[in-house]
Amino acid sequence: MSTLILVFHPHLKDGSRVNARLLAELTAQGEDDIIVRDEYAEYPNFPVNADTEHELLEAADRVILQFPFYWYSSPALLKEWEDEVITAGWAYGGGHALKGKELKLVVTTGSDAAKYRKDGEYSHTMEELLSPFEVVAYK
């Protein structure tokens, strides 16, 4: 099973020990069936190449999105990536390029897990806050 890991962290090299370590360990494994991409290194000025991303996604059986949780959401490049890559006619609206693919999220936060509960400081669970990704995964 081939796995595509897309890392969306704007400060991977200079601001996130956890995400940088995850990326380093994944890359060090050197598995033939795992592709790890630092999307901010690929697209430092944001124009995402949808054709390249489509090819990578089509070739993968499993897609993992790794990102920090910013303001109860994902970083700007991941939002741009979604707008440019997960398009009508390709992923939905007659297109089914992602059908049957497994989607996983690896999300880091600067807060305790206890804050992401109904009775926690944020009054919402992580599952609720990440539900848009679930909708995309099962479209």
PLM features: what roles do these ranges have?
Residues 17-28, 125-139:
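Short, solvent-exposed amphipathic alpha-helices that sit
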Residues 17-21, 48, 76-80:
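Generic recognition of short, well-ordered alpha-helical segments
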Residues 32-44:
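A short beta-strand-loop structural module common to alpha/beta enzyme folds
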